[in-house]
Amino acid sequence: MTRARSYEIRTFGCQMNVHDSERLSGLLEDAGYVKAAPGATADLVVFNTCAVRENADNKLYGTLGHLAPVKAGRPGMQIAVGGCLAQKDRDTVVRKAPWVDVVFGTHNIGSLPVLLERARHNEQAQVEILESLEAFPSTLPAKRESAYAGWVSISVGCNNTCTFCIVPALRGKEVDRRPGDVLAEVQALVDQGVLEVTLLGQNVNSYGASFADPDEPRDRGAFAKLLRACGGIEGLERVRFTSPHPAEFTDDVIEAMAQTPNICPQLHMPLQSGSDRVLKAMRRSYRKARYLGIIEKVRAAMPHAAITTDIIVGFPGETEEDFQETLDVVRQARFTSAFTFQYSKRPGTPAAEMADQVPKQVVQERYDRLIALQEEISLAANRELIGTEVELLVAEGSGKKNAATARMSGRARDGRLVHFRPGGTAEPIRPGDLVTVDITEAAPHHLIADAPVKTHRRTRAGDAHERGITPKTAPIGVGLGLPRIGAPAPEPVAAGCSTGCGA
């Protein structure tokens, strides 16, 4: 008796990595693997890594160290390491963790099944890192994690040279997908019940400048056109995108957002610093006046838009005066929320070698002040919503609750997180359904709706979630000669264990 080999993917980092992991799942399941049950020891563990934070390598190698004795006691188990840290460290991974079987990079995720088979056959670690993109992620199958929301990549890579960021070195120059391929993937998700799609790119509003297809003409207005085209897809209720770059944010995108009903009134646009001097040192090709001007235009077109941002505190050379300028911009911008980061050196970036690194205790003190200011602003903005009605796409997982409330959670169209009490409906509310609720309480990072649910719309996404079904998208677009293999050799099942449980 034999059983299929099981797999587990552990993902670190950004939305790009989350989406890449969906592609890895699709590849592995097409090759005959099955997802390991929660808590079970998988035959294959894949790490999709991040290299952005300073301690990313410590986190990876610590986790690999914990797996070494597990693998030693489980014949046939394999470990693969991919993603940005693998692209950066290459042979270092196998040198530090010789029990790793496969190392692959950001440009060749489609080769993983082949590399796993080669490692099994040769009984030797396989390290394959390519310097340029082998295939768009869209040319690979994907096993989606959600029945109601999906990621769609519109580009890969980045042409910017921010001094704190290592991503362009690891993911390469920007390459854009054809609009028809993007829309075909969106349609494929909607056909399977997905209600919300997030368009992904390192810099989405430069889309159209670097099409991979030489027959596709360069088009600086392509992103606005893509947003409007998404508006024509029947059944697609919400469209989000991340992340735009302020230097290339154009009026036609604002107009498309305001005039296309299913584009969500939400904008996440990284600020990084409110000091023009620091922005110049970061090689961010905009200044605070331009940034605030974009926000002013967005709010004029969409008065209730939620605007969020990223801010780095303690960049090398940042003075107290520079930091005060950041606080001033935060006060003027009135962000709904902000992802704030204490600067940490990224090996391989120009900023890591800069003089005037800010002492840790100074960075921490500034960070605390920024957090306090932003929480004050967020709470004030959220309190203004008390008594208003919002539509929620119900999310998986329980909400902020106790035994009395039994709350569920959902996202409003503007992206705010709302915890609501689900009672009072004729049928049970499920993740993927849509409800309308009245806001009764506010906190800096979420809203509460404890009044009875006003409306409840059951959806195909809710049906799929209830049945435990998530979408699977087939390859879309032109492939680049990826090798294909069959299913891996099945594993013998241990006597008395019909489920393939781990030792």
Curated annotation (Swiss-Prot):
What the entry lists under PANTHER family is as follows: CDK5 REGULATORY SUBUNIT-ASSOCIATED PROTEIN 1 (PTHR43020), MITOCHONDRIAL TRNA METHYLTHIOTRANSFERASE CDK5RAP1 (PTHR43020:SF2)
What this protein needs as a cofactor is: [4Fe-4S] cluster
Q: Can you name one GO molecular function term for this protein? A: 4 iron, 4 sulfur cluster binding
Which leading EC class covers this enzyme? transferase
- Keywords recorded for this protein, A-Z: 4Fe-4S, Cytoplasm, Iron, Iron-sulfur, Metal-binding, S-adenosyl-L-methionine, Transferase, tRNA processing
Q: Name one GO cellular component term.
A: cytosol
Binding-site positions, [4Fe-4S] cluster 2 = 158, 162, 165
* Start and end residues of each Radical SAM core domain: 144-380
Q: Matching Pfam families, A to Z?
A: Radical_SAM, UPF0004
- Its recorded name reads tRNA-2-methylthio-N(6)-dimethylallyladenosine synthase
